[in-house]
Amino acid sequence: MLCLCLYVPIAGAAQTEFQYFESKGLPAELKSIFKLSVFIPSQEFSTYRQWKQKIVQAGDKDLDGQLDFEEFVHYLQDHEKKLRLVFKSLDKKNDGRIDAQEIMQSLRDLGVKISEQQAEKILKSMDKNGTMTIDWNEWRDYHLLHPVENIPEIILYWKHSTIFDVGENLTVPDEFTVEERQTGMWWRHLVAGGGAGAVSRTCTAPLDRLKVLMQVHASRSNNMCIVGGFTQMIREGGAKSLWRGNGINVLKIAPESAIKFMAYEQMKRLVGSDQETLRIHERLVAGSLAGAIAQSSIYPMEVLKTRMALRKTGQYSGMLDCARRILAKEGVAAFYKGYIPNMLGIIPYAGIDLAVYETLKNTWLQRYAVNSADPGVFVLLACGTISSTCGQLASYPLALVRTRMQAQASIEGAPEVTMSSLFKQILRTEGAFGLYRGLAPNFMKVIPAVSISYVVYENLKITLGVQSR
């Protein structure tokens, strides 16, 4: 009689326990599928436990924390189908074998460059007969009990702009795999990212409003500090005033994300790449164009956000009242004040953010991605924080000028100024330091914003039925 005993330790058990299978009376082909070594080197046990947890999560249909025979067989069948599709996608020559060059090409398509020596190292980990190529059987045997479905898992694990929301809107959109696009998982990722952004922006809204106040009102004669800025806001409008401008800031997430995603998919076709995923410079071009289209579409909301953040108690009854008064007093053109420096800021922010993130990602993958492309929470948070900080630092002077231009009519007696004249005025009266007013609260919000958006994103993914990382 066909039977299989699967022992799964209780999660969090203190003692070191090994998972093992016992097969009795099984056909030879099933034995080859079910076999798993009992003796695991201690240094590999941490990775092994991660595999075990992922396998249980992937196959546990009744959510009892362990796999029964039927669940495990279903997991194997489903996983083998996916592995077959991946093998075919990697087999560029269609000869039934994968060599080092094909591995290098597949990773290059994802924007990850590795040497031939590194590709051969990957091959050796799977190559049983020493031919320096991998056939289907070797591929299947190596990956069947490893819940790593494909090399594009790098895309899955290393999503950037979808996961991390630091309040900026200039990042290059993330890539989505063919499977994610075909199954509709892409919109669930976007919804999870939008929800995470809403929570993150709301939690860091006081720092964001302080940044806007310092950008517009701080000067040599009015040296506004962080504590003084918070005190001034609370004294003028109470604690509730710390969240002025947050409503419109959250509201614009949905239309901007949707427009940027659709524009990015169209721009990818225009750049002329026939690959499933774009190379880095192609992503920068397509992402920057998509960002420009999205920003142009929702830019009036950016102006409203700045005006709402700067408003005094009782000045406007709400967003619609603010928009109506701007239209009546200043005309339609007022909704596009600061548009040029905003567009110019896309390239330095998106370019540096993407370049730094990809550099950090590639460095980690080349040095530490032995068994999985999963970097873990802290590596991902560190990479997101560093890349966002570098991008903001490069584009901050343009962001400051944009904000001052957006706020012009809200400052009594402020003359109309152009971008170039405003740059000259700031440099003449405040020096280069004046271009970085408000940078401190802006940097202070990066780490909490990244951390909060990541946690909320992961929880929303579970709610929306997106496969856990």
Swiss-Prot record:
It is a multi-pass membrane protein. Pfam families: EF-hand_7 (PF13499), EF-hand_8 (PF13833), Mito_carr (PF00153). It catalyses: Mg(2+)(out) + phosphate(in) + ATP(out) = Mg(2+)(in) + phosphate(out) + ATP(in). Disruption phenotype: Homozygous knockout mice lacking Slc25a25 are viable, born at the expected Mendelian ratio and fertile. They display resistance to diet-induced obesity and reduced physical endurance. Cellular metabolism is characterized by reduction in total mitochondrial and non-mitochondrial respiration, which leads to reduction in available ATP. InterPro entries: EF-hand-dom_pair, EF_hand_dom, GDC-like, Mit_carrier, Mitochondrial_sb/sol_carrier, Mt_carrier_dom_sf. Residues 1-165 are annotated as: Regulatory N-terminal domain. Keywords: Antiport, Calcium, Membrane, Metal-binding, Mitochondrion, Mitochondrion inner membrane, Repeat, Transmembrane, Transmembrane helix, Transport. Residues 1-189, 265-287, 358-380, 458-469 are mitochondrial intermembrane. Activated by an increase in cytosolic calcium levels that induce a conformational change of the N-terminal regulatory domain, uncapping the channel and allowing transport. It is found in: Mitochondrion inner membrane. The chain crosses the membrane at residues 190-207, 245-264, 288-301, 338-357, 381-398, 438-457. Solcar repeats lie at residues 184-270, 278-363, 375-463. Its main location: mitochondrion. Residues 166-469 are annotated as: C-terminal transmembrane transporter domain. Ca(2+) binds at D60, D62, D64, Q66, E71. PANTHER family: SOLUTE CARRIER FAMILY 25. Electroneutral antiporter that most probably mediates the transport of adenyl nucleotides through the inner mitochondrial membrane. Originally identified as an ATP-magnesium/inorganic phosphate antiporter, it could have a broader specificity for adenyl nucleotides. By regulating the mitochondrial matrix adenyl nucleotide pool could adapt to changing cellular energetic demands and indirectly regulate adenyl nucleotide-dependent metabolic pathways. This is Mitochondrial adenyl nucleotide antiporter SLC25A25.
